[in-house]
Amino acid sequence: ALFQCEDSQIESCLFDNGESPLKEGKNLIVVNTDFGWKYPLWYNRNLTVKNCHFLKDSKSGLWYVKNGTFSSLDIEAVKEFRYCEGIRIEDTSFHHGAETLWNCKDVSLKRLEIQEADYFGFHSSDIEGESLHLVGNYCFDSGKNIYLKDSVLLSKDAFWNAEHVLLVNC
């Protein structure tokens, strides 16, 4: 739909039935928008996404993002946030967080609700998290440089093969 869109604001839209509507964008602000199909935001740089809804079929929606801020999202899809760098996620609900946040680095997480989150954070590094509530097994498997505070992780085998993990008040 908007391939290689730059320096733009997208507001109150619905992207449905069609792959990669905002692929390879730069300096985008996306607000109050619904995504109903897969791969909506791949290979974006300097991306801000706020008050958006990622429906069940928008799986694999946020991959290869460099420098992104994501706030107040409602995410029903699986396999979000892979191979991302320099991302901030806050005040967000992941209803099906399985296989999310894989191979990411330089990640800040604040006030997240993460359900059905098996293998959340796999092989990711340089993560700081605060006020996370995560339900799912094997979270942060093979992760590195992870600092979490004031969080609840209902998980078995969390941090398997992880290195340099610090948990405070968890």
Model segments located where?
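Long, distal/terminal scaffolding or interaction modules
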Residues: 1-170
